[in-house]
């Protein structure tokens, strides 16, 4: 809120504050602006309402002042008058149609303001004009909430008498009684209870009114609620009872009352903390703790993380409370889940008095805690020298390591407190002792840039060139973390060797470069020229081995964007085109990451721009284009020689323009085109940048290419144009732009690819309805061209009913009976894939249900052979397909269903057959459906066939009955025939005897190598729909040599 000086305000405002109506009238007569607004948008009427001056208010309104003007906080004059409890001013404003429902920025109405300010008379004037007294503000609070919070009993009575909802809750589910209890307004609480308020209600966190009163120490409310019988041990959402809350807030009077009433002093919350834990930790919990301990609280109870109340006193430094707990029988060396005792905790947080108390009480200073550390480890690590001194005085071996081999001196060196370090050194700590990682205290001091500790350790004789398990010296760590170079400089002055390489082949120069520490690099370079250092370090003169890393400091600085470090490196390192294991140069990495300053530094020093890596054969220009770093790209192109560098190709023939379009980097696309990039350049698959834009759908890139003359009908190695690809991928915006471009040059967009497919085929196959609609608007697509496997075939085979419907609507119903090169109609395709909705659509357009393809198969046969039960049911029931038709091998639909073992389909067909001749119809191999069903073990079908009069004596071309057809091979069938002949003593003239011996006599050869198999006519034909069509195999177009667009045409189905 802005406080303005009255003397700086207009005369009218000054007159209002002076309370002089005559002067106000005179100023208005002189045309003073009655609607003037200050910088808080307050008007003179706001001022008069604030002062409650009814006469001036009316005078201003009659002179044209806006009665509902809002200031910057959306407060109206009525809000101001109510806040000032001026009944007369409110009456005048209401008389002049002030808005009683006006809301400020907190959504508070004048009634909210009245309730909060005890303006009972004002509220009485407002309430009759309101339709609802339960309107809530932004926090969800009603006027009753505000009245209860402010303790205004008369206002509460008024609101309740006018229909206020006593149990209304705000956005935290708190009711009026919560706020009254929290503020200690006992009379309001009683009033609310007498009107039916729930005393056990809970907010969103399950706090009850008792929790609220206990937290703020309102003892009178607490006693009243307890007298009403509320549960004093009721937990909130965190498991805290009112006793927990009172202890946490140090409300000892409430704690005493709750304990006297029988509250459970040992009840745990969700984390296992008791009230005693809270009392031990809280700022004002000392008296609470005394009360709890005196009333039987368990001083050794542990939380879920193993902490006792003594741990809590140690954590927060509650010295006197720790003494009380210890005197009450607390276990001194109890451990939490990390193994830390209270002494560890006190040492970690530097509570010296607590440490003294704990040691005096017998705490074990040599007890191990987290990671096997002593309390002295933690005190040294945190830099508390007085605590270290106390712990040392208890006496134990200071060189004893923790679980990782680190001594207290390691901890002090890492913590950086010189006093702690010197204390340990003077006590005899071993400064060369190494941990399990091979690191000495000097390694830790260097890694944490603790110059004073490093100085003291080196001065004590610590070895500066000791290697850890990774082969790193303290200098490596200093190079990593030392921004101002002090530690590194001191190590160099004390004979640290900057040429030592770790096990990965990195020396201090690498680490300084990786972290961008320019000063460190300058210091190292001042000792030894970097080129000499890089050449000589890492080699073994005796073994002729070389452990130098393939990544140079130049690579590291360039990759991480440390251009200042790079400037130092390029002054000394001559080979700027050094390559890593994949052949990438520092310039390549800088361009790839978009570090313009690094690119600039390297180019200015003569780094090669057109050098290619080993893997993808890409240059830095490709790297910048791939990731969309336009500034780097401009720098590289502008400094590249020759000029055709803009079209340089990688190993797959891709240009920077192609890569920019592929990744949607419009800025880079324009930069390359403006530099003369060949817009129609092709890669090794014959694809241009426009092909990539069509696949990825980057419309802005496509527009840029078309503006620069890109040809939209160029074909790739599979004959596909960008129009094909955009239609296949469903990018309607790109497709529209390409069609418009084709039209503008009088080109035919309905070209076909190598398999005869047009863009319409592809759009239909993938179900991109918006693309189908757009293509059908073009005149050239109003007739079916290309592969006989038509767009309608493509749509129905993938269940794209919407696309199919569009095609029929646009091209006419005659297309539903179009056939492909094998004579199959769209109905065959729908039947093959069991797409019932498409099947219904085709049948509704008079598709010929009994049309046969080149092998004589009808859609029903196709569905039966492939077990498409939904299609079979529709065709035999709704479409009345002809069940008597036979294919070229004389198989009926029933033969085909049985031959492939599709029992449900066979039963559906059988349900519609009543003609015994059809039941016993034979195919070219003289097999009846019973032969085929029995051979495939279709029990229910066999049973149904027999029930419908199927002949059990019918013989096929091998002379076998259906029973013999069940045999797995010829020999078994012959044996079975012999057994049957023996079992049935009939005359030689019996048909069965003749049949059986005919079957036996057909095979006089006893060779067991001849097996009984299904006849060729029942085998899977080469023309079956094993793979109906693979036109849509291409879901993504990634431009690599192993991810080509899939071959597909109707020959594969």
Swiss-Prot record:
ANK repeat ranges, renumbered to this chain: 40-69, 73-102, 106-135, 139-168, 172-201, 205-234, 238-267, 271-301, 305-334, 338-367, 371-400, 404-433, 437-466, 470-500, 504-534, 549-578, 582-611, 616-645, 652-681, 685-714, 718-747, 755-786, 788-817, 822-851, 855-885, 889-918, 925-954
* GO-annotated cellular components: nucleoplasm
SUPFAM superfamilies named in the record: Ankyrin repeat (SSF48403)
Modified-residue entries (Phosphoserine), positions: 1007, 1011
Tissue specificity here reads:
Widely expressed (at protein level).
InterPro entries assigned: Ankyrin_rpt, Ankyrin_rpt-contain_sf
Q: Does the keyword Hydrolase apply?
A: no
Describe the processing and modification events after translation.
Answer: Ubiquitinated by the ECS(RAB40C) complex leading to its degradation and decreased PP6 activity.
Q: Does the keyword Cytoplasm apply?
A: yes
What does this gene product do? Putative regulatory subunit of protein phosphatase 6 (PP6) that may be involved in the recognition of phosphoprotein substrates. Involved in the PP6-mediated dephosphorylation of NFKBIE opposing its degradation in response to TNF-alpha. Selectively inhibits the phosphatase activity of PPP1C. Targets PPP1C to modulate HNRPK phosphorylation. Involved in the PP6-mediated dephosphorylation of MOB1 and induced focal adhesion assembly during cell migration.
Q: How does it assemble?
A: Protein phosphatase 6 (PP6) holoenzyme is proposed to be a heterotrimeric complex formed by the catalytic subunit, a SAPS domain-containing subunit (PP6R) and an ankyrin repeat-domain containing regulatory subunit (ARS). Interacts with PPP1C and HNRPK. Interacts with PPP6C, PPP6R1 and PPP6R3.
Q: What is this protein called?
A: Serine/threonine-protein phosphatase 6 regulatory ankyrin repeat subunit A
Q: Please state the gene responsible for encoding this protein.
A: Ankrd28
């Amino acid at each position: 809120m802005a406080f303005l000086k009255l003397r700086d305000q207009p005369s009218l405002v000054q007159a209002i504050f002076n309370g002089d109506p005559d002067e106000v009238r005179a100023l208005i007569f002189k045309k003073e602006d009655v609607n003037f607004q200050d910088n808080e948008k307050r008007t003179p009427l706001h001022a008069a309402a604030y002062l409650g001056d009814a006469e001036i208010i009316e005078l201003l309104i009659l002179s044209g002042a806006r009665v509902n003007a809002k200031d910057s906080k959306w407060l109206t004059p009525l809000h101001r008058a109510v806040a000032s409890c001026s009944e007369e001013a409110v009456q005048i404003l209401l008389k002049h149609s002030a808005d009683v429902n006006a809301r400020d920025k907190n959504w508070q109405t004048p009634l909210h303001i009245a309730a909060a300010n005890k303006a009972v008379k004002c509220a009485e004037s407002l309430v009759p004009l309101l339709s609802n007294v339960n309107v809530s503000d932004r926090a969800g609070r009603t006027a009753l909430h505000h009245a209860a919070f402010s303790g205004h009993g008369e206002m509460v009575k008024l609101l309740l008498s006018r229909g206020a909802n006593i149990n209304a809750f705000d956005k935290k589910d708190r009711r009026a009684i919560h706020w009254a209890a929290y503020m200690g307004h006992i009379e309001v609480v009683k009033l609310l209870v007498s009107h039916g308020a729930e005393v056990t209600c809970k907010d969103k966190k399950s706090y009850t009114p008792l929790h609220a009163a206990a937290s703020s120490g309102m003892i009178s409310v607490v006693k009243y609620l307890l007298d009403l019988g509320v549960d004093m041990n009721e937990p909130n959402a965190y498991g805290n009872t009112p006793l927990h809350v009172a202890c946490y807030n140090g409300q000892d009077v409430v704690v005493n009352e709750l304990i006297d009433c029988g509250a459970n002093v040992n009840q745990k919350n969700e984390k296992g903390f008791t009230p005693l834990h809270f009392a031990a930790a809280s700022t004002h919990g000392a008296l609470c703790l005394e009360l709890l301990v005196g009333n039987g609280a368990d001083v050794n109870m542990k939380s879920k993380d193993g902490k006792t109340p003594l741990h809590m006193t140690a954590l927060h430094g509650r010295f006197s409370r720790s003494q009380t707990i210890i005197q009450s029988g607390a276990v001194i060396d109890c451990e939490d889940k990390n193994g830390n005792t209270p002494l560890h905790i006190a040492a970690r947080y530097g509570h010296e008095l607590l440490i003294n108390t704990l040691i005096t009480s017998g705490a074990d200073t040599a007890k191990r805690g987290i990671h096997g550390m002593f309390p002295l480890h933690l005190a040294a690590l945190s830099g508390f020298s007085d605590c270290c001194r106390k712990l040392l005085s208890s006496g134990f071996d200071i060189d004893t390591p923790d679980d990782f081999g680190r001594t207290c001196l390691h901890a002090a060196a890492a913590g950086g407190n010189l006093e702690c370090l010197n204390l340990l050194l003077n006590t005899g700590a071993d400064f060369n002792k190494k941990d399990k990682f091979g690191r000495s205290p000097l390694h830790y001091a260097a890694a944490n840039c603790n110059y004073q500790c490093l100085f003291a350790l080196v001065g004590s004789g610590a070895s500066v060139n000791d290697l850890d398990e990774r082969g790193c010296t303290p200098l490596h760590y200093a190079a990593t973390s030392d921004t101002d170079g002090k530690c590194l400089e001191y190590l160099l002055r004390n004979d640290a060797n900057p040429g030592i390489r770790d096990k990965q082949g990195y020396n201090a120069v690498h680490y300084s470069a990786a972290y961008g520490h320019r000063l460190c690099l300058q210091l190292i370079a001042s000792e030894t020229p970097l080129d000499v250092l890089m050449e000589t370090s890492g080699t073994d003169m005796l073994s002729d081995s070389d452990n130098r890393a393939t990544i140079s400091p130049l690579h590291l600085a360039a990759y991480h964007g440390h251009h200042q470090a790079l400037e130092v490196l390029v002054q000394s390192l001559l080979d700027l085109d050094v390559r890593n294991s994949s052949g990438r140069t520092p310039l390549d990495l800088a361009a790839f990451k978009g570090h313009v300053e690094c690119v600039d530094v390297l180019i200015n020093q003569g780094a090669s721009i057109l050098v290619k890596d080993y893997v993808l054969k890409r240059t830095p220009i490709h790297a910048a284009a791939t990731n969309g770093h336009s500034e780097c790209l401009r720098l590289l192109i502008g400094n590249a020689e020759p000029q055709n560098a803009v079209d340089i190709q990688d190993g797959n023939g891709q240009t920077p323009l192609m890569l920019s379009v592929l990744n949607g980097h419009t800025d880079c696309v324009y930069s390359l085109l403006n530099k003369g990039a060949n817009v129609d350049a092709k890669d090794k698959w014959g694809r241009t940048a426009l092909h990539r834009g069509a696949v990825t759908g980057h419309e802005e890139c496509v527009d840029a290419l078309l503006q620069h003359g890109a040809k939209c009908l160029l074909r790739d190695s599979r004959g596909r144009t960008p129009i094909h690809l955009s239609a296949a991928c469903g990018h309607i915006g790109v497709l529209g732009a390409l069609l418009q471009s084709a039209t503008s040059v009088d080109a035919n967009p309905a070209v076909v690819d190598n398999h005869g497919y047009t863009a319409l085929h592809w759009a239909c196959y993938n179900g991109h309805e918006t693309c189908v609609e757009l293509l059908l608007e073009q005149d050239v697509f109003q007739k079916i061209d290309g592969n006989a496997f038509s767009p309608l075939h493509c749509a129905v085979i993938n269940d794209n009913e919407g696309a199919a419907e569009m095609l029929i609507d646009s091209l006419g119903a005659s297309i539903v009976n179009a056939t492909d090169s094998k004579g199959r109609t769209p109905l065959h395709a729908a039947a093959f894939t069991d797409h019932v909705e498409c099947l219904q659509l085709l049948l509704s357009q008079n598709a010929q249900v009994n049309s046969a393809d080149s092998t004589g198969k009808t859609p029903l046969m196709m569905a039966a052979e492939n077990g498409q039960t939904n299609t079979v049911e529709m065709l035999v029931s709704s479409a009345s397909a002809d069940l008597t038709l036979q294919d070229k091998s004389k198989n009926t639909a029933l033969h085909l269903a049985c031959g492939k073992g599709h029992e449900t389909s066979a039963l559906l067909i059988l349900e519609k057959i009543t003609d015994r001749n059809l039941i016993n119809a034979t195919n070219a191999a003289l097999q009846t459906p019973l032969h085929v069903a029995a051979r495939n073990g279709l029990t229910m079908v066999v049973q149904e066939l027999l029930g419908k009069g199927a002949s059990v004596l019918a013989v096929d071309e091998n002379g076998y009955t259906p029973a013999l057809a069940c045999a797995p091979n010829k020999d078994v069938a012959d044996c079975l025939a012999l057994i049957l002949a023996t079992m049935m003593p009939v005359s030689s003239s019996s048909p069965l005897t003749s049949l059986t011996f005919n079957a036996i006599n057909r095979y006089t050869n006893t060779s067991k190598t001849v097996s009984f198999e299904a006849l060729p006519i029942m085998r899977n034909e080469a023309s079956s729909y094993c793979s109906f069509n693979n036109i849509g195999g291409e879901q993504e177009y990634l431009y690599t040599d192993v991810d080509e667009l899939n071959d597909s045409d109707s020959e594969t189905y």
